Swiss-Prot record:
PANTHER family: DISEASE RESISTANCE PROTEIN RPP2B, LEUCINE-RICH REPEAT-CONTAINING PROTEIN
Species this protein is from: Arabidopsis thaliana (Mouse-ear cress)
Origin superkingdom: Eukaryota
Protein name as annotated: Disease resistance protein RPP2B
SMART domains linked to this entry: TIR
Pfam families recorded: C-JID, LRR_3, NB-ARC, TIR, WHD_ROQ1
């Protein structure tokens, strides 16, 4: 069973009071001390004054009050030492300071510090007659003298004779707050993972240190995201900075219950130190507010009038004041807030911790609950409220109850959670509710422009309503897609079922397959039904009568689709109906019917309202025989309708923007398209009957034209001068149309695999907007036309598999970024005549596979932006030494360079080197790269099938890798990374049969199990080195495009708790480098070694639990395996041996690694690198984000934590 234990308290001690005040009553009780106590209490500080015990209470009770206080204020006055009671107090206070860090603030009221310290002046007499106090106990008297001296040396305050007492009290209060914060700060609860980072972000926006402005900050987010919690933490940590402060809770509820005038009176009462201000008599008390620096938090604000009534205008507040408005309505903040903090969801780790703390009282689940915990965390999607309520409901229940609860939640949302979330829905008006439910039930994740068009009506401007829903945190619009939280989605669908829940035909929105089958088979639908979305994967068959849609007269949305088969899935057998339906509702706006089983639409259907029509994979031959009113149509998709003959019925679709006819293999006429003057997108891919475009065919608005796969298309003419993307891939054209310069907006020209294409137009260079030119696979193309003028926009030029032997003059392609010239492996013809790339300073990716290159020019180093260089299958024997100056180079592909004998010093930022199959390679530079300590830069060196590398060379490679891992790990610790870093810092691979001897844990097979020594996870722990030997020789070879060597580690404690991680040791990805890649085949054993940084919450596990060492990991296991590109385990190769070492940071003076040879050259060069790096420009050493190649590298070296705990 799952049991909870108490989590850490939010306070550090069990103190009942903030401050104990020690004073001499006769001196100050009725003036200074009474003022001080009143002032402290007015600022919210809990004060104990020993005046309460003057009536004869025992001194032991007085000492108890000192012990129950966080700090003491000692008011030294003229007669203070004449009271043995006061002396006892100060002795006890100083004892507590020494033993328990009790805070002490001395105030010297009309007495000098030196008199207290040296017992002179008024403090002298009592110590001249020691028998009068403490019965002459000399030891006690000496202790009191030391206490007085120590107290007087503490920084405190001397009462100013000629200054204002209120100003003096202000200073005391400020210092008291500071000391209380230091002694017992508002400790952020450890049962709220993620709250610290969120509160700091809010504090940044509030800019507390700036007293020259009044600042209003909004805290925004959906219900249950933690807005109030974050603001409350910030409030409690900072309220002491202000003269007045108040946190008004739940204004929406309290304003309805008590009214805004009451809340405003309450606010003023707190801000003005309890003064009763009659708002009705005095109006708004601006003068009172201007005199104080205030901190106000308004929680759960839902209306503009609440802000106006409670806060008013900013100019009535004193500079330095701060106001926080907590709301789920962004619109309220647009004119009232200077900045807005949007509270994010919890990430996976934070969510798992919060859930486990609620249920188990620890940061991780017990072993039997791991998988179910992951499922519940996934269900909550980072919403703290959901995690707390779910955890509360699961507390003390066994695993069977958990399983049943999870199954129940898949169908029925949690009632308590839904009740909380519905408050947001109930605040909407009718139009907002309608649009919200349509999105939740039907259109979640669709494009926002599409949804607004579909939901638009005479009464509703859906675009405005969607913006309002976004402002209220009920939906988000990201990358033009409309999204909502999973739990809000579930809430919307639950609300959608509520009306007439027993009669499906009377509900407005239907998606349950049983309900839909019922109303279609029994014709029980009514005009109430607004939308029907049927997932055909959930039903076997439906008897569809011709009159099935007759009663659904108000139906607007109809969709029959298959979630299991996005492509053709033979869905026509589902509907058992021999004839076309008699009727479709004329109010249909949205009609999607995948695999529509009839050859036309109902003849009496008037599509005057139809905006979106999709009949992919249908049996339709034509839409209608007669012309229809289709002016509302904007999107039509008839893709893969193999029987479609023509487009009759669409000639009046003058507002159509997108027409998809992909795979309509019987279509050969496009006459109706001529009238589509608003058409932007036309897809005719794989229309194999299409031989040419109609003469005089012009569509001025067209921007994307796809003719790829039209195998019979031999001729192409320009049909729009507005085209931006032109796809002619795989067509039979022999030349591109002349006068192509008229395509002044053309960005992409795709001529891939046009095998009959022999010529490109001479005026190609006049395409001034062209960014990407794809010529790959144009095997008959032997040359490019001269580039007579600069093509400044061209960034991508792909010429793989062509017969081109001379590249164009690259000086006119000065902004070229990616150039690929890869020739097939079977092509033994002459390669490139020259390499004219020296002037391309922006070139970042260069692919030159199988180009018969035997030498790189020295000017190659001028390609200062180059990040990916592929030279595979060339005749190079060595690389120029100047290659070291390619400081941006991340990836170097040298696969199958069979003549390559040596490698010089390579660029310092290189992250991925693949020298597979370099059979002549004997020597590598020492070091291979200068190990710059760029933060979190990972490196992979692959030397598979490099059989001439001797053992010394391999050891040097490993030594360099280990040195670099130490430097990177030290940098990582220096930057104090938080979270989980399991990436391999360095990974190497080479032919071999043995685990290096310095690996302390070695086993045959693929599993290591070991007990952990005490204190193994000390402050110098930085990760692990891992090693495996993989055999390929008993197999025909590994043919996967990707191979990853992975390790699943499991750390377990005595009490059964555990945490599991997945490491990556390295491997390869054939898509890295050459675009003409092929799976590699290995025929021998290979060694894989990696050094993995491991900054994981292991310390937190042991330190933050109250079970002490029982929670500290005491055993560990490491299981190694191999996966392919689909993450499936590989069975075609075997792990023979494995090894593991923990890594610890070296002392600064340690110049050696344990058990491994490090050459002097490596040590010397690394030291030089550490010195040199300080003098380099930031652009040289910063970590660059490089798009595709960077993604490929990280994809190769990435690793993951399995859901926090093991999944």
């Amino acid at each position: 069973m799952a049991f909870a234990s108490s989590s850490s308290s939010i306070v550090l001690s069990k103190c009942e009071f903030d401050v104990f005040v020690s004073f001499r009553g006769a001196d100050t009780r009725h003036d200074f001390t009474s003022h001080l106590v009143k002032y402290l209490r007015g600022k919210g500080i809990d004060v104990f004054s020993d005046a309460k015990l003057r009536g004869g209470e025992y001194i032991s009770l007085l000492f108890d009050r000192i012990e129950q206080s966080k700090m003491s204020i000692v008011v030294f006055s003229e007669d203070y030492a004449n009271s043995w009671w006061c002396l006892e107090e100060v002795g006890k206070i100083m004892q507590r300071r020494k033993e328990f860090n009790h805070g002490v603030l001395p105030i010297f009221y009309k007495v000098s510090k030196s008199d207290v310290s040296n017992q002179t002046g008024s403090f002298e007499a009592v110590f001249q007659s020691p028998t009068k106090i403490f019965n002459g106990d000399e030891q006690k008297i000496e202790e009191l003298k030391v206490a007085l001296k120590t107290a007087s040396n503490i920084r405190g305050f001397v009462y100013p004779e000629n200054s204002s007492e209120p100003d003096f009290l202000d200073e005391i209060v400020k210092n008291t707050f500071r000391m209380l914060n230091e002694l017992s700060p508002c400790v952020i609860p450890d049962d709220l993972p993620g709250i610290e980072s969120r509160s700091k972000e809010l504090e940044k926006l509030l800019m507390f240190d700036n007293d020259e402005c009044v600042r209003v900050v909004g805290v925004l987010g959906m219900t249950g995201i933690g807005k109030t919690t974050v603001a409350d933490i910030v409030y409690k940590q900072n309220f002491q900075r202000f003269d007045g402060y108040e946190f008004l809770e739940d204004i929406e509820d309290n304003s309805k219950r008590y009214g805004l005038p009451y809340l405003y009176q309450k606010l003023l009462h707190k801000l003005l130190d309890g003064e009763n201000v009659d708002v009705r008599a005095q109006g708004r008390p601006e003068n009172f507010l201007r005199n104080k620096k205030l901190f106000i938090v308004l929680d759960n604000v839902t209306e503009e009038k609440q802000i106006e009534y409670l806060i008013g205008k900013k100019n009535v507040y004193r500079q330095g004041s701060r106001i926080v408005i907590i709301t789920r309505d962004k619109k309220l903040l647009q004119k009232n807030a200077d900045a807005t903090y949007v509270v994010p969801r919890l990430n996976d780790r934070e969510a798992m911790e919060l859930f486990c703390l609620q249920v188990f009282g620890n940061h991780y689940p017990t072993e039997e609950f791991v998988d179910l915990s992951n499922d519940f965390v996934c269900y909550a999607k980072g919403l703290p409220l959901a995690l707390k309520l779910l955890g509360k409901g699961l507390l003390t229940h066994d695993i069977n109850y958990w399983k049943k609860k999870l199954e129940f939640l898949q169908v029925n949302p949690d009632k308590e959670l839904q009740k909380e979330l519905k408050s947001s829905y109930k605040a909407l008006d009718d139009d907002q509710k309608s649009v919200f439910l349509d999105i939740a039930c039907f259109f979640r994740s669709e494009k926002a422009d599409f949804v607004s068009s579909i939901l638009k009506s005479d009464d509703i401007d859906a675009k405005d309503v969607m913006r309002e829903l976004e402002e209220k945190c009920l939906v988000t619009i990201s990358y033009d897609r409309i999204e909502m939280h999973d739990l809000l989605h579930a809430m919307g669908k639950e609300i959608g079922k509520e009306k007439s829940i027993r009669k499906a035909g009377e509900r407005r929105r239907l998606w349950n397959h049983k309900d839909i089958r019922d109303i279609l088979e029994h014709n029980t639908g009514t005009e109430c039904v607004r939308g029907i979305f049927l997932n055909m994967s959930e039903v076997r068959r439906i008897k569809l009568f011709p009159a099935a849609f007759t009663m659904l007269s108000k139906l607007k949305f109809l969709k029959f689709h298959s979630s299991h088969c996005s492509q053709w899935c033979d869905n026509d057998h589902i509907f058992q109906c021999s004839k076309v339906p008699d009727h479709f509702p004329d109010e249909l706006v949205y009609l999607h019917w995948q695999g529509y089983p009839y050859d036309c639409l109902p003849s009496d259907f008037d599509p005057k309202e139809l905006v979106d029509l999709s009949l992919r994979y249908s049996h339709i031959k034509q839409l209608w025989e007669d012309e229809k009113n289709t002016e509302s149509l904007r999107w039509v998709d008839l893709g893969q309708s193999k029987d479609l003959l023509n487009l009759s019925g669409l000639s009046r679709a003058k507002n159509l923007e997108r027409l998809d006819l992909e795979g309509c293999t019987s279509l050969d006429l496009l006459g109706s398209v001529k009238q589509m003057n608003e058409l932007i997108y036309l897809n005719l891919r794989d229309c194999t009957s299409l031989e040419s475009l109609p003469k005089g065919f012009k569509i001025k608005s067209l921007k994307t034209l796809i003719l790829s796969g039209c195998l019979k298309l031999k001729d192409f003419h320009i049909i729009s001068e507005s085209i931006e993307s032109l796809h002619l891939e795989g067509t039979a054209i022999e030349r591109v149309v002349e006068h192509i310069e008229s395509l002044h907006s053309l960005i992409l020209l795709n001529l891939k695999n046009c095998e009959k294409l022999k010529y490109l137009p001479n005026d190609l260079y006049k395409l001034k907007s062209l960014q990407e030119l794809v010529l790959s696979g144009c095997s008959a193309l032997e040359s490019l036309p001269p580039i007579k003028e600069k093509m400044e926009c061209l960034e991508i030029l792909l010429m793989d598999g062509t017969s081109i032997k001379q590249t164009p003059e690259m000086s006119c392609l000065s902004n070229l970024k990616i150039c690929s010239f890869c020739r097939p492996v079977i092509d033994d013809s002459t390669g490139l005549v020259v390499l004219p790339f020296s002037g391309n300073s922006f070139l970042s990716d260069l692919y030159l596979t199988n180009c018969n290159i035997d030498k790189l020019p020295d000017k190659f180093s001028s390609l200062r932006s180059l990040r990916c260089l592929c030279l595979s299958r060339n005749n190079i024997e060595t690389l120029p030494e100047s290659i070291e100056k390619l400081y941006s180079l991340l990836l170097l592909d040298l696969k199958h360079c069979c003549r390559l004998k040596s490698l010089p010093l390579l660029p310092s930022n290189l992250q991925y080197l693949d020298a597979h199959g370099c059979g002549s390679l004997e020597n590598v530079s020492k070091p291979l790269t200068i190990p710059l300590v760029t933060e979190r830069m990972h490196t992979t060196f692959i030397f598979t099938d490099c059989f001439k590398l001797n053992q010394a060379e391999k050891e040097d490679i490993v030594a360099q890798a280990q040195l670099k891992s130490q430097l990177l790990a030290r940098t990582s610790r220096h930057h104090n990374h938080k979270g989980l870093l399991l990436d391999p810092l360095v990974a190497v691979c080479f032919p071999g049969h043995d685990i290096p001897s310095w690996f302390s844990h070695q086993k045959m097979g693929s599993l290591i199990e070991t007990d952990l020594l005490p204190h193994w996870c000390n402050s110098k722990f930085i990760g692990a080195s891992l090693c495996v030997v993989v055999t390929f020789k008993d197999h025909e070879g590994h043919h996967a495009n990707r191979l990853s060597v992975r390790c699943k580690s499991k750390f377990k404690s005595q009490n059964g708790q555990f945490i599991s991680f997945s490491f990556c040791l390295g491997g390869w990805n054939e898509s890295c480098g050459s675009s003409c890649h092929e799976p590699r085949k290995l025929g021998s054993d290979h060694v894989f070694i990696s050094y993995n940084n491991c900054n994981v919450p292991v310390f937190k596990w042991s330190e933050e639990t109250n079970e002490g060492n029982r929670c500290h990991p005491t055993s560990a296991s490491f299981e190694f395996y191999l996966t392919d590109e689909t993450e499936r385990k590989l069975e075609c190769c075997e792990i023979l041996r494995c090894g593991m070492n923990f890594l610890y940071a070296r002392d600064e003076n340690d110049r050696k690694f344990q058990g491994i040879r490090v050459t002097d050259t490596v040590e010397r060069t690394s030291s030089e690198a550490l010195v040199t790096i300080r003098g380099q420009s930031h652009s040289r050493i910063e970590e660059r984000r490089y798009g595709r190649i960077r993604d490929e590298i990280m994809d190769m070296t990435g690793s993951s934590m399995i859901g926090g705990p093991e999944s």
